Amino acid sequence: MVTENTISSERATPVTFTVPNTTPVTKTPEWQALVAHATQAKGTTIKDLFRDDPGRAGDMTFDAGPLHVDLSKNLADENTLRLLTNVARAMGIENYRQSMFNGEHINTTEDRAVLHTALRIPIEQDMTVDGQDVAEDVHGVLGRMRDLARALRKGDWRGVTNHTIKNVVNIGIGGSDLGPAMAAKALRPYCTAGITPYFVSNVDPSDITSTLDGLDPESTLFVVSSKTFTTSETLANAHAAKRWLLRELGHTGVDVKDDAVVKDAVAKHFVAVSTNAEAVAEFGIDTRNMFGFWDWVGGRYSVDSAIGLSLMAAIGPRDFMEFVGGFHEVDNHFYSEPLEMNVPVLMGLLGVWYTSVLGSQSHLVLPYSDDLADFPSYLQQLMMESNGKSRRLNGDLTTVETGEVYWGAQGTNGQHAFMQLIHQGTHLIPTDFIGFVNPHTDAVASDGETSMHDMLLSNFLAQSRVMAFGRDEDEVREAGVEEELVPHKVMPGNRPSTTIVADKLTPRTLGALIALYEHIAFVQGVVWGINSFDQWGVELGKKQANELLPKLGANNGGADVSTGDSSTDSLTKHILRNRRR
């Protein structure tokens, strides 16, 4: 269930947002003190920090909802964290946080509120944004989602041939796909009602073709997720899905030449997550089966909105509300805890420390759970689309490096792929380890006794330990290694990491984990002075793709394919010359 609310409900209708501090972070005395500290601390190792402070692990471990977070293996001491929180305060983090939760328009380039946190507020909470009762709206949509999910799971929703629905295919892209797809895989043990979710996003036709191959059209429902219902990739896949549905239904005896039958088939096999009722109706979807969301919810922050409809259908309304409750727990923690004990704040500031002070270029995420295999990809959009910016809010260039390149894979696979570079390479790559005390399933290893989950956890603990403390020459020699191999087997250590542990990968835990990184992105954006909630680079790419598309069309008739640059011109001509229609 959604947890008890501790965020203040006494919030006024938002006023025009005023940026708390317009000074570049590098011009603040707090930043200069941080840089001076970095110079002074140069050469200090993680091993030194543990040696000098026996209580370090206890002092730097915190709980945020169901998440137990150990920051002690980072290249930072209490003084570093104090200086970082001073920087955050100087940049107005507390006022910014309040403004976000108040529904003020902190997305300044689009003049919008940023209120993904409102997606998980209790219905009794009083929150009005731009004159609209947010809690009532949110729970109204959740109620309609719940009704549809229950109808699907109970077999009350029937296709045009009266078959129950067994397959739910979500068609979207970006935030309309990555979140629900990741969450559906992460929560596979909770998909118990015979509803199998599928996800189509890529405009590459092989994506939808391979997904639909083998599915029964009579038992398949499509969820078309596009706020504007104009996203080109999503609409291309939606129309391909409609053609497939009608073709395959025709093979079962459905009269797909009868317009009334076609209308009925589309209405019973398609629903929409959108706000464009006219376009939804034009496609053929009954607007009573359209689920909306709001311009104060960015796509990459929308998995717990109607965008999660396919997820709710798969795991059920009760577990979906547990998922939402996990978000809310971390929202409460982020809103109410002092900066010095606030996990999203501290993790976000450590990212600033590594990126903008110590020169790190990327951030590795290693979930030791196969169910969480897609979590690093999800974080790529959340973190990189949010903070991949080089302009401050006033339009000036940033004065520090911003944004972290997120990447990763599930453990232990990553150990046999890229961990060599982490342990003995030359790059500084802070790492987040994510593990779970209890598995959903377990098995024994080849000896017939050892738990495979224990094997997983032993690797989980060992990797962060080797990263932090390494192995010096004396230890290598003590292990009996031949002298000429000693330098090759030295592990320098001093590789920073954060360890996140939860009891089990449940809907609640996953919601908390996502909310943690949502707030990390926010904290970093405030310190860097950028807008974490627009994505103009993505928009320009869409525009130019639409301009290039006619030049690649089958009916271009030898028309001019000039694009304005010789490279794109040459590539376009090469494609046209070698195309086989």
Where are these regions (language model features)?
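Extended, charge-enriched "interface" segments that sit outside catalytic cores
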Residues: V19-E30, V35-T161, T450-M452, L457, ...
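Active-site phosphate/pyrophosphate-binding segments
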Residues: R247-A443, G493, L540-N546, N555-R581
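Helicase-primase coupling helices
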Residues: W407-K504
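Glycine-rich phosphate-binding loops that contact phosphosugars or nucleotide phosphates
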Residues: D147-G155, N162-E337
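C-terminal accessory domains/tails appended to large, multi-domain proteins
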Residues: M491-R495, T499-W528, F533, L540, ...
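Short glycine-rich or small-residue beta-strand-to-loop segments that form or flank ligand, phosphate
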Residues: K166-G172, F222-T228, S362-S369, V405-Y406, ...
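Conserved active-site and cofactor/substrate-binding residues in soluble primary-metabolism enzymes
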Residues: P29, G55, L75, N79, ...
